[in-house]
Protein backbone atom coordinates (compact mmCIF):
# COMPACT_ATOMS: atom_id res chain seq x y z
CA UNK A 1 0.00 0.00 0.00
CA UNK A 2 1.77 3.12 -1.25
CA UNK A 3 -0.66 5.54 0.40
CA UNK A 4 -2.61 5.31 3.64
CA UNK A 5 -6.27 6.22 2.92
CA UNK A 6 -7.54 8.80 5.37
CA UNK A 7 -10.42 11.29 5.51
CA UNK A 8 -9.50 14.71 6.91
CA UNK A 9 -11.78 17.01 8.88
CA UNK A 10 -10.97 20.41 7.37
CA UNK A 11 -13.87 22.43 8.75
CA UNK A 12 -12.41 25.90 9.52
CA UNK A 13 -8.87 24.53 9.16
CA UNK A 14 -6.33 26.87 7.53
CA UNK A 15 -5.24 25.59 4.10
CA UNK A 16 -3.03 27.17 1.44
CA UNK A 17 -3.55 26.92 -2.30
CA UNK A 18 -0.72 28.15 -4.54
CA UNK A 19 -1.92 29.00 -8.04
CA UNK A 20 -4.66 31.16 -9.51
CA UNK A 21 -5.66 29.40 -12.72
CA UNK A 22 -8.37 26.96 -13.75
CA UNK A 23 -6.67 23.93 -12.21
CA UNK A 24 -6.36 25.78 -8.92
CA UNK A 25 -10.06 26.68 -9.20
CA UNK A 26 -11.01 23.01 -9.19
CA UNK A 27 -8.91 22.37 -6.10
CA UNK A 28 -10.37 25.43 -4.38
CA UNK A 29 -13.91 24.13 -4.92
CA UNK A 30 -13.03 20.90 -3.14
CA UNK A 31 -11.48 22.72 -0.20
CA UNK A 32 -14.45 25.07 0.07
CA UNK A 33 -16.87 22.13 -0.08
CA UNK A 34 -14.99 20.63 2.88
CA UNK A 35 -15.41 23.88 4.84
CA UNK A 36 -11.71 24.78 4.92
CA UNK A 37 -10.42 28.30 5.58
CA UNK A 38 -8.66 28.80 2.26
CA UNK A 39 -5.86 31.22 1.42
CA UNK A 40 -4.88 31.45 -2.25
CA UNK A 41 -1.48 32.73 -3.35
CA UNK A 42 -0.73 33.68 -6.98
CA UNK A 43 0.46 36.53 -9.14
CA UNK A 44 -2.79 36.49 -11.14
CA UNK A 45 -6.26 35.13 -10.35
CA UNK A 46 -9.23 34.09 -12.45
CA UNK A 47 -12.50 35.98 -12.14
CA UNK A 48 -13.92 33.12 -10.09
CA UNK A 49 -11.28 33.63 -7.41
CA UNK A 50 -12.11 37.34 -7.22
CA UNK A 51 -15.81 36.48 -6.91
CA UNK A 52 -15.13 34.05 -4.07
CA UNK A 53 -12.98 36.63 -2.31
CA UNK A 54 -15.69 39.30 -2.62
CA UNK A 55 -18.16 36.84 -1.07
CA UNK A 56 -15.77 36.25 1.83
CA UNK A 57 -15.34 32.57 1.00
CA UNK A 58 -11.53 32.71 0.79
CA UNK A 59 -8.56 35.09 1.04
CA UNK A 60 -6.26 36.15 -1.79
CA UNK A 61 -2.54 36.87 -1.37
CA UNK A 62 -1.08 38.41 -4.52
CA UNK A 63 2.60 37.90 -5.35
CA UNK A 64 5.30 35.25 -5.47
CA UNK A 65 5.15 32.28 -3.12
CA UNK A 66 7.04 32.68 0.14
CA UNK A 67 7.60 29.88 2.70
CA UNK A 68 6.18 32.13 5.41
CA UNK A 69 2.72 31.59 3.90
CA UNK A 70 2.81 28.03 5.27
CA UNK A 71 2.76 29.19 8.87
CA UNK A 72 -0.04 27.49 10.84
CA UNK A 73 -1.41 25.79 7.73
CA UNK A 74 -2.74 22.23 7.87
CA UNK A 75 -2.02 21.45 4.25
CA UNK A 76 -1.00 23.07 0.99
CA UNK A 77 -1.79 22.38 -2.66
CA UNK A 78 0.55 23.60 -5.40
CA UNK A 79 -1.35 24.08 -8.66
CA UNK A 80 0.81 26.41 -10.73
CA UNK A 81 2.22 25.79 -14.22
CA UNK A 82 5.76 26.57 -13.01
CA UNK A 83 7.84 23.53 -12.02
CA UNK A 84 10.28 25.59 -9.94
CA UNK A 85 7.50 27.20 -7.89
CA UNK A 86 5.82 23.86 -7.27
CA UNK A 87 9.16 22.36 -6.18
CA UNK A 88 9.75 25.23 -3.76
CA UNK A 89 6.29 24.79 -2.26
CA UNK A 90 6.93 21.07 -1.75
CA UNK A 91 10.39 21.62 -0.24
CA UNK A 92 9.12 24.32 2.13
CA UNK A 93 6.13 22.20 3.19
CA UNK A 94 8.38 19.22 3.99
CA UNK A 95 10.64 21.39 6.12
CA UNK A 96 7.65 22.68 8.09
CA UNK A 97 5.93 19.25 8.23
CA UNK A 98 2.88 20.42 6.34
CA UNK A 99 1.12 17.95 4.06
CA UNK A 100 1.62 18.96 0.43
CA UNK A 101 0.05 17.97 -2.86
CA UNK A 102 1.66 19.08 -6.12
CA UNK A 103 -0.82 18.64 -8.96
CA UNK A 104 0.28 16.04 -11.54
CA UNK A 105 3.63 15.45 -9.80
CA UNK A 106 3.48 12.25 -7.68
CA UNK A 107 7.19 12.51 -6.76
CA UNK A 108 6.61 15.84 -5.02
CA UNK A 109 3.49 14.89 -3.14
CA UNK A 110 2.98 13.81 0.46
CA UNK A 111 -0.77 13.30 -0.03
CA UNK A 112 -2.88 12.68 -3.10
CA UNK A 113 -6.40 13.80 -3.91
CA UNK A 114 -8.55 10.88 -5.05
CA UNK A 115 -11.57 10.81 -7.31
CA UNK A 116 -14.51 11.47 -5.02
CA UNK A 117 -18.10 10.27 -4.92
CA UNK A 118 -19.97 12.61 -2.60
CA UNK A 119 -23.16 11.32 -1.04
CA UNK A 120 -22.53 13.10 2.25
CA UNK A 121 -22.26 11.76 4.86
CA UNK A 122 -21.31 8.79 2.67
CA UNK A 123 -18.01 9.53 0.94
CA UNK A 124 -16.15 7.22 -1.43
CA UNK A 125 -12.60 7.94 -2.55
CA UNK A 126 -10.86 6.15 -5.44
CA UNK A 127 -7.16 6.42 -6.14
CA UNK A 128 -4.62 4.78 -8.41
CA UNK A 129 -1.74 6.24 -6.42
CA UNK A 130 -1.07 8.65 -9.25
CA UNK A 131 -0.39 5.79 -11.67
CA UNK A 132 -3.60 5.92 -13.71
CA UNK A 133 -5.82 8.91 -12.84
CA UNK A 134 -8.01 8.35 -15.93
CA UNK A 135 -8.74 4.80 -14.73
CA UNK A 136 -9.67 6.14 -11.30
CA UNK A 137 -12.03 8.61 -12.96
CA UNK A 138 -13.66 5.87 -15.04
CA UNK A 139 -14.17 3.75 -11.91
CA UNK A 140 -15.74 6.72 -10.19
CA UNK A 141 -18.14 7.23 -13.10
CA UNK A 142 -19.22 3.58 -12.92
CA UNK A 143 -19.84 3.79 -9.18
CA UNK A 144 -21.62 7.14 -9.55
CA UNK A 145 -24.07 5.47 -11.91
CA UNK A 146 -24.70 2.56 -9.54
CA UNK A 147 -25.19 4.52 -6.32
CA UNK A 148 -28.56 6.28 -5.84
CA UNK A 149 -28.50 10.03 -5.31
CA UNK A 150 -30.50 9.74 -2.08
CA UNK A 151 -27.84 7.55 -0.42
CA UNK A 152 -26.66 10.42 1.75
CA UNK A 153 -30.19 11.14 2.95
CA UNK A 154 -30.59 7.48 3.81
CA UNK A 155 -27.36 7.51 5.83
CA UNK A 156 -28.50 10.65 7.64
CA UNK A 157 -31.83 9.02 8.48
CA UNK A 158 -30.02 5.95 9.82
CA UNK A 159 -27.87 8.17 12.01
CA UNK A 160 -30.93 9.89 13.42
CA UNK A 161 -32.52 6.52 14.26
CA UNK A 162 -29.53 4.78 15.86
CA UNK A 163 -30.41 5.51 19.46
CA UNK A 164 -34.06 4.63 18.97
CA UNK A 165 -33.15 1.33 17.33
CA UNK A 166 -30.89 0.43 20.27
CA UNK A 167 -33.72 1.08 22.69
CA UNK A 168 -36.38 -0.69 20.62
CA UNK A 169 -34.47 -3.89 19.77
CA UNK A 170 -32.58 -5.62 22.55
CA UNK A 171 -31.01 -8.35 20.41
CA UNK A 172 -28.23 -7.52 17.96
CA UNK A 173 -29.74 -9.88 15.37
CA UNK A 174 -33.02 -7.96 15.47
CA UNK A 175 -31.18 -4.67 15.06
CA UNK A 176 -29.29 -6.01 12.06
CA UNK A 177 -32.48 -7.27 10.44
CA UNK A 178 -34.16 -3.90 11.04
CA UNK A 179 -31.28 -2.02 9.41
CA UNK A 180 -31.29 -4.38 6.43
CA UNK A 181 -35.01 -3.80 5.94
CA UNK A 182 -34.73 -0.04 6.31
CA UNK A 183 -31.70 0.38 4.07
CA UNK A 184 -33.20 -1.71 1.24
CA UNK A 185 -36.79 -0.42 1.53
CA UNK A 186 -37.61 0.77 -1.99
CA UNK A 187 -40.65 2.90 -1.13
CA UNK A 188 -38.79 4.57 1.72
CA UNK A 189 -35.91 5.31 -0.65
CA UNK A 190 -38.31 6.83 -3.17
CA UNK A 191 -39.87 9.02 -0.46
CA UNK A 192 -36.41 10.25 0.52
CA UNK A 193 -35.62 11.04 -3.11
CA UNK A 194 -38.92 12.96 -3.33
CA UNK A 195 -38.14 14.77 -0.05
CA UNK A 196 -41.54 13.63 1.24
CA UNK A 197 -40.90 13.71 4.98
CA UNK A 198 -44.44 12.62 5.88
CA UNK A 199 -44.12 9.44 3.82
CA UNK A 200 -40.63 8.81 5.19
CA UNK A 201 -41.93 8.93 8.77
CA UNK A 202 -44.84 6.65 7.90
CA UNK A 203 -42.54 4.03 6.38
CA UNK A 204 -40.21 4.22 9.39
CA UNK A 205 -43.07 3.74 11.85
CA UNK A 206 -44.34 0.76 9.86
CA UNK A 207 -40.91 -0.83 10.10
CA UNK A 208 -40.77 -0.29 13.86
CA UNK A 209 -44.28 -1.56 14.54
CA UNK A 210 -44.60 -4.61 12.25
CA UNK A 211 -43.01 -7.95 13.22
CA UNK A 212 -39.64 -8.27 11.54
CA UNK A 213 -40.64 -11.52 9.86
CA UNK A 214 -43.59 -9.81 8.14
CA UNK A 215 -41.62 -7.01 6.53
CA UNK A 216 -41.30 -8.36 3.03
CA UNK A 217 -41.91 -6.35 -0.12
CA UNK A 218 -42.15 -6.90 -3.86
CA UNK A 219 -40.49 -4.77 -6.52
CA UNK A 220 -41.81 -5.19 -10.06
CA UNK A 221 -38.84 -4.60 -12.37
CA UNK A 222 -38.82 -4.26 -16.15
CA UNK A 223 -35.76 -6.07 -17.53
CA UNK A 224 -35.95 -4.45 -20.96
CA UNK A 225 -36.11 -6.27 -24.29
CA UNK A 226 -32.88 -8.30 -24.09
CA UNK A 227 -29.67 -6.29 -24.18
CA UNK A 228 -28.46 -6.14 -20.56
CA UNK A 229 -27.15 -2.64 -21.24
CA UNK A 230 -30.76 -1.47 -21.55
CA UNK A 231 -31.60 -2.47 -17.98
CA UNK A 232 -32.16 0.74 -15.99
CA UNK A 233 -29.80 1.73 -13.18
CA UNK A 234 -32.60 1.41 -10.67
CA UNK A 235 -33.49 -2.00 -12.05
CA UNK A 236 -29.87 -3.10 -11.60
CA UNK A 237 -29.85 -1.85 -8.02
CA UNK A 238 -33.02 -3.80 -7.25
CA UNK A 239 -31.90 -7.16 -8.64
CA UNK A 240 -28.63 -6.85 -6.72
CA UNK A 241 -30.51 -6.36 -3.45
CA UNK A 242 -33.10 -9.11 -3.91
CA UNK A 243 -33.54 -12.16 -1.69
CA UNK A 244 -35.72 -13.80 -4.34
CA UNK A 245 -36.03 -13.15 -8.08
CA UNK A 246 -39.12 -14.48 -9.87
CA UNK A 247 -38.46 -14.34 -13.61
CA UNK A 248 -39.81 -15.62 -16.92
CA UNK A 249 -38.53 -16.72 -20.30
CA UNK A 250 -38.32 -13.23 -21.78
CA UNK A 251 -35.60 -12.15 -19.33
CA UNK A 252 -32.25 -12.62 -21.06
CA UNK A 253 -29.39 -14.67 -19.62
CA UNK A 254 -27.25 -11.53 -19.71
CA UNK A 255 -29.65 -9.75 -17.36
CA UNK A 256 -29.91 -12.78 -15.07
CA UNK A 257 -26.13 -12.79 -14.77
CA UNK A 258 -26.42 -9.42 -13.02
CA UNK A 259 -28.69 -10.78 -10.27
CA UNK A 260 -27.27 -11.00 -6.75
CA UNK A 261 -25.34 -14.28 -6.62
CA UNK A 262 -26.95 -15.71 -3.48
CA UNK A 263 -30.51 -14.71 -4.39
CA UNK A 264 -33.03 -17.51 -4.82
CA UNK A 265 -34.23 -17.74 -8.42
CA UNK A 266 -37.73 -18.94 -9.28
CA UNK A 267 -38.43 -19.53 -12.98
CA UNK A 268 -42.08 -19.22 -13.98
CA UNK A 269 -41.55 -19.75 -17.71
CA UNK A 270 -44.23 -17.53 -19.23
CA UNK A 271 -44.56 -17.22 -23.00
CA UNK A 272 -47.31 -16.37 -25.44
CA UNK A 273 -50.14 -18.90 -25.28
CA UNK A 274 -48.36 -21.25 -22.88
CA UNK A 275 -47.59 -20.71 -19.20
CA UNK A 276 -45.32 -23.18 -17.45
CA UNK A 277 -46.71 -21.68 -14.24
CA UNK A 278 -50.30 -20.33 -14.36
CA UNK A 279 -50.73 -16.63 -13.61
CA UNK A 280 -52.72 -17.31 -10.42
CA UNK A 281 -49.88 -19.45 -9.13
CA UNK A 282 -47.33 -16.75 -9.96
CA UNK A 283 -49.40 -14.31 -7.92
CA UNK A 284 -49.34 -16.73 -5.00
CA UNK A 285 -45.58 -17.24 -5.26
CA UNK A 286 -45.02 -13.49 -4.96
CA UNK A 287 -47.43 -13.28 -2.04
CA UNK A 288 -45.95 -16.22 -0.14
CA UNK A 289 -42.35 -15.10 -0.58
CA UNK A 290 -43.15 -11.58 0.62
CA UNK A 291 -45.08 -12.92 3.61
CA UNK A 292 -41.91 -14.73 4.66
CA UNK A 293 -40.25 -11.36 5.08
CA UNK A 294 -38.21 -11.54 1.89
CA UNK A 295 -37.30 -8.82 -0.57
CA UNK A 296 -38.81 -10.11 -3.79
CA UNK A 297 -38.07 -8.86 -7.30
CA UNK A 298 -40.56 -9.82 -9.98
CA UNK A 299 -38.39 -9.51 -13.08
CA UNK A 300 -40.29 -9.25 -16.36
CA UNK A 301 -39.10 -8.77 -19.93
CA UNK A 302 -39.68 -5.31 -21.42
CA UNK A 303 -41.88 -3.08 -19.29
CA UNK A 304 -44.07 -4.79 -16.66
CA UNK A 305 -47.07 -2.53 -17.35
CA UNK A 306 -47.13 -3.04 -21.13
CA UNK A 307 -48.67 -6.45 -21.88
CA UNK A 308 -46.76 -7.86 -18.92
CA UNK A 309 -49.72 -8.52 -16.60
CA UNK A 310 -47.86 -6.59 -13.94
CA UNK A 311 -51.02 -4.83 -12.85
CA UNK A 312 -52.73 -8.16 -12.16
CA UNK A 313 -49.86 -9.31 -9.96
CA UNK A 314 -49.84 -6.10 -7.97
CA UNK A 315 -53.60 -6.28 -7.40
CA UNK A 316 -53.09 -9.52 -5.50
CA UNK A 317 -50.35 -7.95 -3.37
CA UNK A 318 -52.50 -4.90 -2.67
CA UNK A 319 -55.35 -7.16 -1.49
CA UNK A 320 -53.00 -8.53 1.20
CA UNK A 321 -51.36 -5.18 2.07
CA UNK A 322 -47.95 -6.28 0.80
CA UNK A 323 -45.72 -3.24 0.09
CA UNK A 324 -44.75 -2.99 -3.57
CA UNK A 325 -43.14 -0.62 -6.04
CA UNK A 326 -42.49 -0.57 -9.77
CA UNK A 327 -39.33 0.04 -11.80
CA UNK A 328 -40.26 0.64 -15.46
CA UNK A 329 -38.31 -1.01 -18.25
CA UNK A 330 -37.70 -0.29 -21.92
CA UNK A 331 -40.61 -1.93 -23.69
CA UNK A 332 -40.00 -4.24 -26.66
CA UNK A 333 -41.59 -1.83 -29.14
CA UNK A 334 -39.11 0.89 -28.27
CA UNK A 335 -36.04 -1.32 -27.97
CA UNK A 336 -36.64 -3.55 -30.99
CA UNK A 337 -37.58 -0.70 -33.31
CA UNK A 338 -34.53 1.33 -32.29
CA UNK A 339 -32.18 -1.63 -32.79
CA UNK A 340 -33.79 -2.29 -36.17
CA UNK A 341 -33.44 1.26 -37.48
CA UNK A 342 -37.22 1.78 -37.52
CA UNK A 343 -38.45 5.01 -35.89
CA UNK A 344 -41.93 4.41 -34.52
CA UNK A 345 -42.98 7.97 -35.36
CA UNK A 346 -41.76 10.26 -38.14
CA UNK A 347 -43.28 13.48 -39.44
CA UNK A 348 -43.40 12.15 -42.99
CA UNK A 349 -44.73 8.72 -42.10
CA UNK A 350 -46.53 8.34 -38.76
CA UNK A 351 -48.00 10.75 -36.23
CA UNK A 352 -49.01 8.04 -33.77
CA UNK A 353 -48.06 4.54 -32.70
CA UNK A 354 -50.33 1.73 -31.51
CA UNK A 355 -49.13 -1.05 -29.22
CA UNK A 356 -51.38 -4.07 -29.68
CA UNK A 357 -51.35 -7.51 -28.10
CA UNK A 358 -51.75 -10.47 -30.40
CA UNK A 359 -52.69 -12.59 -27.43
CA UNK A 360 -55.78 -10.90 -25.99
CA UNK A 361 -58.63 -12.64 -24.18
CA UNK A 362 -60.74 -14.82 -26.46
CA UNK A 363 -63.78 -12.56 -26.30
CA UNK A 364 -61.77 -9.42 -27.17
CA UNK A 365 -62.33 -7.76 -30.54
CA UNK A 366 -59.90 -5.33 -32.13
CA UNK A 367 -61.13 -2.25 -33.98
CA UNK A 368 -59.54 -3.21 -37.28
CA UNK A 369 -60.98 -0.27 -39.20
CA UNK A 370 -59.27 2.10 -36.80
CA UNK A 371 -56.02 0.14 -36.92
CA UNK A 372 -55.99 0.25 -40.73
CA UNK A 373 -55.97 4.07 -40.78
CA UNK A 374 -53.10 5.97 -42.42
CA UNK A 375 -50.19 7.82 -40.81
CA UNK A 376 -49.67 5.50 -37.87
CA UNK A 377 -47.40 2.65 -36.85
CA UNK A 378 -48.73 -0.63 -35.49
CA UNK A 379 -46.65 -2.80 -33.18
CA UNK A 380 -48.03 -6.25 -32.37
CA UNK A 381 -46.73 -8.02 -29.29
CA UNK A 382 -47.03 -11.83 -29.17
CA UNK A 383 -48.63 -11.71 -32.61
CA UNK A 384 -46.65 -14.37 -34.42
CA UNK A 385 -49.35 -17.05 -34.27
CA UNK A 386 -51.92 -14.46 -35.42
CA UNK A 387 -49.89 -13.08 -38.33
CA UNK A 388 -52.27 -14.46 -40.95
CA UNK A 389 -55.29 -12.96 -39.18
CA UNK A 390 -53.52 -9.60 -38.80
CA UNK A 391 -52.66 -9.55 -42.51
CA UNK A 392 -56.17 -10.50 -43.57
CA UNK A 393 -58.00 -8.05 -41.31
CA UNK A 394 -55.81 -5.03 -42.05
CA UNK A 395 -56.08 -5.51 -45.83
CA UNK A 396 -59.82 -6.19 -45.57
CA UNK A 397 -60.29 -2.90 -43.68
CA UNK A 398 -58.41 -0.78 -46.19
CA UNK A 399 -54.70 -0.91 -45.43
CA UNK A 400 -52.69 -1.19 -48.68
CA UNK A 401 -51.28 -4.66 -49.27
CA UNK A 402 -47.91 -3.08 -50.09
CA UNK A 403 -47.57 -1.49 -46.64
CA UNK A 404 -44.06 -2.26 -45.31
CA UNK A 405 -43.81 -4.72 -42.42
CA UNK A 406 -40.95 -6.06 -40.31
CA UNK A 407 -40.68 -8.94 -37.87
CA UNK A 408 -37.97 -8.61 -35.22
CA UNK A 409 -36.81 -11.83 -33.58
CA UNK A 410 -34.79 -11.71 -30.32
CA UNK A 411 -34.71 -7.93 -30.54
CA UNK A 412 -31.73 -5.98 -29.10
CA UNK A 413 -29.80 -9.19 -28.44
CA UNK A 414 -26.74 -10.43 -30.31
CA UNK A 415 -29.07 -12.99 -31.92
CA UNK A 416 -31.42 -10.34 -33.32
CA UNK A 417 -32.85 -11.16 -36.74
CA UNK A 418 -35.13 -8.94 -38.81
CA UNK A 419 -37.30 -10.15 -41.66
CA UNK A 420 -39.08 -7.49 -43.72
CA UNK A 421 -41.46 -7.32 -46.65
CA UNK A 422 -45.01 -6.19 -47.42
CA UNK A 423 -48.25 -6.66 -45.52
CA UNK A 424 -49.49 -9.12 -48.14
CA UNK A 425 -46.53 -11.35 -47.20
CA UNK A 426 -46.93 -11.18 -43.41
CA UNK A 427 -48.22 -14.74 -42.97
CA UNK A 428 -45.33 -16.05 -45.05
CA UNK A 429 -42.79 -13.93 -43.19
CA UNK A 430 -44.03 -15.19 -39.84
CA UNK A 431 -42.97 -18.72 -40.78
CA UNK A 432 -39.36 -17.56 -41.03
CA UNK A 433 -39.01 -16.37 -37.44
CA UNK A 434 -39.64 -17.81 -34.01
CA UNK A 435 -40.80 -16.41 -30.69
CA UNK A 436 -40.09 -13.98 -29.13
CA UNK A 437 -40.81 -11.77 -32.11
CA UNK A 438 -42.40 -8.38 -32.64
CA UNK A 439 -44.41 -7.32 -35.71
CA UNK A 440 -44.09 -3.72 -36.93
CA UNK A 441 -46.51 -2.46 -39.59
CA UNK A 442 -46.32 0.95 -41.26
CA UNK A 443 -44.44 3.06 -43.76
CA UNK A 444 -41.76 3.84 -41.15
CA UNK A 445 -40.40 0.35 -41.86
CA UNK A 446 -39.23 1.68 -45.24
CA UNK A 447 -36.67 3.82 -43.38
CA UNK A 448 -34.91 0.76 -42.05
CA UNK A 449 -32.54 0.38 -44.99
CA UNK A 450 -31.26 3.91 -44.43
CA UNK A 451 -31.32 4.08 -40.63
CA UNK A 452 -30.29 0.58 -39.62
CA UNK A 453 -27.15 0.77 -37.50
CA UNK A 454 -27.19 -2.42 -35.46
CA UNK A 455 -26.45 -4.85 -38.29
CA UNK A 456 -23.23 -3.08 -39.23
CA UNK A 457 -21.81 -3.25 -35.71
CA UNK A 458 -20.20 -6.22 -34.05
CA UNK A 459 -21.50 -7.16 -30.62
CA UNK A 460 -19.59 -8.68 -27.78
CA UNK A 461 -16.68 -11.08 -27.97
CA UNK A 462 -18.40 -13.29 -30.48
CA UNK A 463 -18.49 -10.52 -33.08
CA UNK A 464 -21.94 -11.68 -34.13
CA UNK A 465 -23.98 -9.49 -36.43
CA UNK A 466 -27.68 -9.01 -36.81
CA UNK A 467 -29.13 -11.21 -39.51
CA UNK A 468 -31.28 -9.37 -42.03
CA UNK A 469 -33.61 -10.85 -44.58
CA UNK A 470 -36.03 -9.27 -46.96
CA UNK A 471 -38.78 -10.88 -48.95
CA UNK A 472 -39.92 -9.40 -52.24
UniProtKB/Swiss-Prot annotation:
Keywords: Cobalamin biosynthesis, Lyase, Methyltransferase, Multifunctional enzyme, NAD, Oxidoreductase, Phosphoprotein, Porphyrin biosynthesis, S-adenosyl-L-methionine, Transferase. SUPFAM superfamilies: NAD(P)-binding Rossmann-fold domains (SSF51735), Siroheme synthase middle domains-like (SSF75615), Tetrapyrrole methylase (SSF53790). PROSITE patterns: SUMT_1, SUMT_2. NAD(+) binds at residues 22-23, 43-44. InterPro entries: 4pyrrol_Mease, 4pyrrol_Methylase_sf, 4pyrrole_Mease_sub1, 4pyrrole_Mease_sub2, CobA/CysG_C, NAD(P)-bd_dom_sf, Siro_Cobalamin_biosynth, Sirohaem_synt_dimer_dom_sf. The keyword Acetylation does not apply. Its EC number is 2.1.1.107, 1.3.1.76, 4.99.1.4. GO terms for biological process: cobalamin biosynthetic process; methylation; siroheme biosynthetic process. Residues 1-204 are annotated as: Precorrin-2 dehydrogenase /sirohydrochlorin ferrochelatase. Pathway: Cofactor biosynthesis; adenosylcobalamin biosynthesis; precorrin-2 from uroporphyrinogen III: step 1/1; Cofactor biosynthesis; adenosylcobalamin biosynthesis; sirohydrochlorin from precorrin-2: step 1/1; Porphyrin-containing compound metabolism; siroheme biosynthesis; precorrin-2 from uroporphyrinogen III: step 1/1; Porphyrin-containing compound metabolism; siroheme biosynthesis; siroheme from sirohydrochlorin: step 1/1. Pfam families: CysG_dimeriser, NAD_binding_7, Sirohm_synth_M, TP_methylase. One of its GO terms (molecular function) is NAD binding. The active site is at 248 (proton acceptor), 270 (proton donor). S-adenosyl-L-methionine binds at residues 225, 301-303, 306, 331-332, 382, 411. Residues 216-472 are annotated as: Uroporphyrinogen-III C-methyltransferase. In the N-terminal section; belongs to the precorrin-2 dehydrogenase / sirohydrochlorin ferrochelatase family. Then it catalyzes the NAD-dependent ring dehydrogenation of precorrin-2 to yield sirohydrochlorin. Finally, it catalyzes the ferrochelation of sirohydrochlorin to yield siroheme. This is Siroheme synthase 2. It comes from Yersinia enterocolitica serotype O:8 / biotype 1B (strain NCTC 13174 / 8081). The lineage of its organism: Bacteria, Pseudomonadati, Pseudomonadota, Gammaproteobacteria, Enterobacterales.
Amino acid sequence: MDYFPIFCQLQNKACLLVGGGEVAERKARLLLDAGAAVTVNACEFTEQFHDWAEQGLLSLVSGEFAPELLAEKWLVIAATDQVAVNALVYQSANQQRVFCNVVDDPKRTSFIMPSIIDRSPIMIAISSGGKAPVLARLLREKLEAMLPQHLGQLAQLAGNLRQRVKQHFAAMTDRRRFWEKLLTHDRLAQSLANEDQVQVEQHVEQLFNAPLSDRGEVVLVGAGPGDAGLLTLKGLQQIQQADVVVYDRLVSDEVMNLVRRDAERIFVGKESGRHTVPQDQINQILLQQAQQGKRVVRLKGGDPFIFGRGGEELETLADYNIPFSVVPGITAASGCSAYSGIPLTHRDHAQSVRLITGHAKKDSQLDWANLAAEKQTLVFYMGLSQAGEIQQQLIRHGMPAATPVALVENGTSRHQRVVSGELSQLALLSQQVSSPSLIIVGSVVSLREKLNWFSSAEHGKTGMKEQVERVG
